[in-house]
Amino acid sequence: MGLKVNVSAIFMAVLLTLQTPTGQIHWGNLSKIGVVGIGSASYKVMTRSSHQSLVIKLMPNITLLNNCTRVEIAEYRRLLRTVLEPIRDALNAMTQNIRPVQSVASSRRHKRFAGVVLAGAALGVATAAQITAGIALHQSMLNSQAIDNLRASLETTNQAIEAIRQAGQEMILAVQGVQDYINNELIPSMNQLSCDLIGQKLGLKLLRYYTEILSLFGPSLRDPISAEISIQALSYALGGDINKVLEKLGYSGGDLLGILESRGIKARITHVDTESYLIVLSIAYPTLSEIKGVIVHRLEGVSYNIGSQEWYTTVPKYVATQGYLISNFDESSCTFMPEGTVCSQNALYPMSPLLQECLRGSTKSCARTLVSGSFGNRFILSQGNLIANCASILCKCYTTGTIINQDPDKILTYIAADHCPVVEVNGVTIQVGSRRYPDAVYLHRIDLGPPILLERLDVGTNLGNAIAKLEDAKELLESSDQILRSMKGLSSTCIVYILIAVCLGGLIGIPALICCCRGRCNKKGEQVGMSRPGLKPDLTGTSKSYVRSL
């Protein structure tokens, strides 16, 4: 009984030590042909955005300073008009070409709002982003009453940052850039400073504020229809505290970084008031949705040698797994961080069955291609072990000073601390850890996949050969076309006469040929009979004279 328990324990220990595939990708078999995974992360997609209105009041309330700051305020208003009027004209050009579409209900004969139509003929040239932004502008046109109420509220407030909540609507954040300076610096010192000095200080502060607005909100001011907002502008608009965005939307620090790097936060100017000097922006914060069960893996490859030829395995740079399914992953719209992968759109698309078999451990399904020049990695560090193609680069044990030679029967060398604690490869010194990969991968034990050509030089050469062959085929086709055209030039009656003459010649010539053949055969038979007479008689014992007479 004890023996059975020991055998079972040993069997379970062996099973636990075997290298098994994780996440449907057989990293053990892939490492034999130089493919390793260098990272995995969760998968998040940006979905429907939540919007917040941001109002920037460029003109502060200076009721108590009117007598001392008239010249500075007049100059500041002139500067603001040079910025705001072009933006207003651009917004008007878009909003004037948008009209609502109303439908008539079947049960009740009244009109209701159904959507908007963009007058493309009158608008001229517009990008897709500008058209989308134009539709969003129409929503701000419907909120004109709310904007009027907002203007009235801001005329009387002296707060630098104020949250105004409209009835039944979202919160609107109002920002007045220099109001704190006026409230805390200029007004308390009115009795100590002269009127000219107060005006000069306010003028310098307004000019600095004007410069900050141009630099921070530059993209929105240059392209008011479709623009993006920077992290600096967002922080400035929220009073210098970016944590307000995190608290409001429930973002983590990594999520916000991913959204900013992928340009997920959009800010569009929806309204400009040149009388009250207001800019209304609509800021869209996307919502992140984590796709449960989807893991994004990054793959890297190392070249390997078969004799004097250097190869590498062709696999995608990124793949995704979900259960048993393995999918391709388009990283063009994604941002990669240690906390996860954030994509602005769905990046998954189907993978061919042959490539799935390759990633599941069937090395004979993995295509390979020749290395061109210095292309490709020749060593990589994975799980503390160094996987190197020591047949193409110099591998040296830094601890002992000896050269690490690669057996010709091996395609790669796996170096761990039991072999050499410190390795120098291609001029780089690396300290390796305990062994995680077996250094017993021989060529005759691996089923390699089919070779393919992917190098730019080969593709160009093959393309040139194909073009040359097409040119030759074109010349042959042109010559055949000339023959066909010459044949078409003959009349149909001539062709009929030629066919009749050929048939008559055949009818006359065939019997004559048969007669000639028979005559020649008869002559040959007579010549054979004369040259070969019958058997000679036995002349033994006959006299010579008789023989002569014969």
Curated annotation (Swiss-Prot):
Residues 1-23 form the signal peptide. Residues 139-215 are annotated as: HRA. The record marks 112-113 as: Cleavage. One of its GO terms (biological process) is symbiont entry into host cell. It is a single-pass type I membrane protein; Single-pass membrane protein. Residues 138-166, 462-487 form a coiled coil. InterPro entries: Fusion_F0_Paramyxovir. It holds the Pfam family Fusion_gly. The inactive precursor F0 is glycosylated and proteolytically cleaved into F1 and F2 to be functionally active. The cleavage is mediated by host furin during the transport and maturation of the polypeptide. One of its GO terms (cellular component) is host cell plasma membrane. The chain crosses the membrane at residues 488-518. Residues 113-138 are annotated as: Fusion peptide. Disulfide bonds join 334-343, 358-366, 390-395, 397-420. Keywords: Cleavage on pair of basic residues, Coiled coil, Disulfide bond, Fusion of virus membrane with host cell membrane, Fusion of virus membrane with host membrane, Glycoprotein, Host cell membrane, Host membrane, Membrane, Signal, Transmembrane, Transmembrane helix, Viral envelope protein, Viral penetration into host cytoplasm, Virion, Virus entry into host cell. Residues 445-494 are annotated as: HRB. It is found in: Virion membrane; Host cell membrane. Residues 519-550 are cytoplasmic. Glycans are attached at residues 29, 61, 67. Residues 69-95 are annotated as: HRC. Homotrimer of disulfide-linked F1-F2. Belongs to the paramyxoviruses fusion glycoprotein family. Contains 3 heptad repreat regions, HRA, HRB and HRC. Class I viral fusion protein. Under the current model, the protein has at least 3 conformational states: pre-fusion native state, pre-hairpin intermediate state, and post-fusion hairpin state. During viral and plasma cell membrane fusion, the heptad repeat (HR) regions assume a trimer-of-hairpins structure, positioning the fusion peptide in close proximity to the C-terminal region of the ectodomain. The formation of this structure appears to drive apposition and subsequent fusion of viral and plasma cell membranes. This is Fusion glycoprotein F0. The gene is F.
